[in-house]
Structure formats: structure tokens, C-alpha cells
A protein has these predicted regions:
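Nucleotide-activated sugar donor-binding and catalytic core shared by glycosyltransferases
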Residues: 1-171
Length: 171
């Protein structure tokens, strides 16, 4: 049993929620053992959460939660919008290593509709560094085509690793 955690942070990202709620995505996730889902839908107005097959998927869905770190800590796969805060929560694996055996796979989906498409830049840089996998909405299903061993993990317990990455990004 694998836990899939989807988060859109405080934004409205209906397209991401609709994509993960689609029958095709559900089937792929189930085939790969993700039968427990937590979906944080933020200010989304879509009603597609009801399309998730609860006879096959254990589901917890909410707009906001004061204890969201708990879900980052236990997820096996994190699908996040491209917000820097959410990405950092997903990749800061060492903070959670006391609670878990491994760092989760983190997949980011930039929300291109936001001002100046600002999420794409940080997502692309982190993807280039092998920290996260980055997908567009229409290619999100491809995350199930990769073996777990293909995901590179970056240990961010050393603050200098993150500082160097951030400095490179900003320069």
C-alpha cells in the first residue's frame, strides 16, 4: 500500500486536481500500488474529488490543514504544484528521516497560469539538479513509467547544499 499526497498549496490549480481525479490517472496509480490518497485542494473550485473511486482508494481530501507536514512526512509519492514552499516541504527529506525509511518521490507540476509563469523557473532548475521530477499536466501519467531507482535523491540536511542551489538559481 502506497500513500499518494497531492498538494496545490494555497493556490487554485483546478487542472492538477482534475488530472489526478481522472479515471486514467486513478487506474495507473492503483496499478502501481497507490491505494491511499491525501488530496489538499486549496482554493480549488472543481468538484471532481467525488470522481475518485472510494471502493478502491482510501481518500482524505481537504482545502487546508494546519498539520500538512504530517502528510509530507508519510507520503511515498508527492505530487505538488510548483510553489517553492511546497517543493521544499517535499524534498526536505532529512527532517523526516526520523519518521520514515526513505525520502519520497517528489513530482512537481508548475501552474503556468500564475503571474509570469514564475513556478516553471524553480521547477526546471530543481529538475535539472535531479531533486524533483517535473511534469506537465498532460504528461503527469508518465511518473508511473519510471522505476523508483531512477529518481535521484538530494539530501538537504546540509544547509549549504540548498544555499548553493538557491544561489545558482538566482544568479
Amino acid at each position: 500500500m502506497g500513500l499518494l499526497f497531492v498538494t496545490v498549496g494555497s493556490t487554485k490549480f483546478d487542472d492538477l486536481i482534475e488530472t489526478v481525479c481522472s479515471e486514467g490517472f486513478q487506474n495507473r496509480a492503483l496499478t502501481h500500488g497507490y491505494d491511499s490518497w491525501v488530496v489538499q485542494f486549496g482554493s480549488s473550485t472543481c468538484r471532481c474529488i467525488g470522481n475518485i473511486d472510494r471502493s478502491k482508494i482510501e481518500l482524505l481530501a481537504f482545502d487546508y490543514n494546519d498539520n500538512i507536514d504530517d502528510y509530507f512526512a508519510i507520503a511515498d509519492l508527492i505530487i505538488s504544484h510548483g510553489g517553492t514552499g511546497s517543493i521544499l516541504d517535499g524534498i526536505r527529506g532529512p527532517a523526516f528521516l526520523e519518521k520514515r525509511d526513505s525520502i519520497p518521490k517528489v513530482v512537481v507540476v508548475p501552474n503556468h497560469s500564475l503571474l509570469h509563469d514564475h513556478q516553471s523557473q524553480i521547477c526546471e532548475k530543481l529538475h535539472e539538479q535531479g531533486v524533483v521530477d517535473m511534469k506537465t499536466l498532460n504528461r503527469l501519467h508518465e511518473i508511473f513509467n519510471r522505476e523508483d531507482s531512477e529518481y535521484r535523491k538530494l539530501n538537504l540536511c546540509n544547509d549549504s547544499v540548498f544555499k548553493n542551489l538557491l544561489t545558482e538559481f538566482l544568479s
